Amino acid sequence: MLKTVWLNEQPNMKQGVAMLLGGFDGLHAGHRKLLEKAKENGSLVGLMTIIGGKNGESLFTNPERELIFKEAGADFVFELPFAEIKNLSPLEFLQMLEREFSPNMFVCGEDFRFGLQAKGTPNFIKEYTQVRVEVLPLVEINGEKVSATRVKRLLSEGRVEEVKQCLTHDFFLIGEVFADRKIGRIIGFPTANILYPKGKYPLKKGVYETRTVVNGKAYKGITNYGARPTFDDETVLTETYLDGFSGDLYGKSLKVEFVRFLREIKKFDSAEALKKQLNEDIARVRNHD
């Protein structure tokens, strides 16, 4: 079922609609150029996102994407279930968008493809619509195109600082803290434990410097994403120690931002050896601007 999610209340459709075309699994640097162009004419800005696509895990969950889009200044998201649109011809796809929103502007990248067998192109849009069409060149960083595929490759390698260059913000997850075995508390490092969201593309397992916001305050910290071999626990979790925080986070939803990769996960000979390493990890984090 097609679904429109309004990110701001009481939209005024008389403003017109500028529609961004693409997959929009989050917003990378190229997408943000499209958004800037769409906002130039004072219209409402909408973008589409594909739900349940053929490319496997997404970079962000639906709530995470909506947060990114809203913070970037978009007004609405048009959610398109892949199963419902995969057989539409390019013309049928274009007609669907015009029927739903009567846009006065389409904005896309030069590599945008759509419709059955991806036969639709920016030139096709220009030929078959009377709507203004803006086609922007691809954005490159260090000589390589910015894309979701590139971001996923970097995540698989733990290169989250380069991911930030591509996304223009830190890679993050949002999840609810649950009560676990409280091993961290026992050794002096209480952690907020979150299950990695189902369907979200996994980053490389390891220990990361992270930033977590609680009640409007950002806390530096360290996050173990993966198993806990020192305690013979192979469950994959996201365990975050918030430096300087005291309080109960159970049941609360947290946003954890991954700042940089610190080290691989390893099995220590004892809890004391692990504690010594964690103290070294947090010292590195405190000294990092």
Cite the ranges covered by each PLM segment.
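N-terminal catalytic cores of NTP/NDP-binding nucleotidyl/phosphoryl-transfer enzymes
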Residues: 8-63, 67
